[in-house]
Design a protein with these regions (language model features):
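Positively charged n-region of N-terminal signal peptides that target proteins for export
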Residues: 1-4
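Hydrophobic h-region of N-terminal signal peptides that target proteins for export
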Residues: 9-18
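Short, acidic, Ser/Thr-enriched surface-loop or helix-capping motifs
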Residues: 15, 71-72
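Local sequence-structure signature of Cys/Sec-based thiol-disulfide redox active-site neighborhoods
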Residues: 18-46
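Short, internal strand/loop/helix patches
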Residues: 43-60
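Flexible, solvent-exposed short loops/turns enriched in glycine
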Residues: 49-50, 64, 84-88
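Non-catalytic, surface beta->alpha helical segment in thiol-disulfide oxidoreductase systems
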Residues: 73-106
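Structural micro-motif
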Residues: 60-71
Length: 106
């Protein structure tokens, strides 16, 4: 019985986790002063990674850092916010939060 409850708990936790929108911020170590503070964002799993830790194909596809990638529960990229020439993301927290809310309604 204990094992059955454990399995059910893991499956439910996995299902609940898979319903989340994921935000991945990728930046370079030399640009860490321009990391975007995502602590105010709700309704999404927030992750951070350095560019050097990404596979080469992803490293080569990123033209500017930092970049914020918003993915739906299926892992599909729904929106990207990319730094401008100042190496900073100009999007507001409200813009990012609104995008998360929009994706969660789909």
């Amino acid at each position: 019985m204990k094992k059955l409850l454990s399995v059910i708990f893991v499956l439910v936790a996995g299902f609940v986790y898979s319903q989340d929108v994921t935000i991945l911020q990728i930046n370079a170590e030399w640009n860490k002063k321009n990391n975007y503070d995502l602590s105010e964002i709700t309704g999404a799993v927030v992750k951070f990674s350095y560019l050097k830790d990404q596979p080469l194909d992803i490293q080569n596809s990123i033209m500017a850092v930092p970049v914020i990638v918003i993915m739906d529960k299926n892992g599909r990229i729904r929106r990207q916010f990319i730094a401008d020439i100042s190496l900073q993301i100009k999007a507001t927290h409200l813009e990012i939060q609104n995008e998360i809310n929009r994706i969660k309604k789909l």
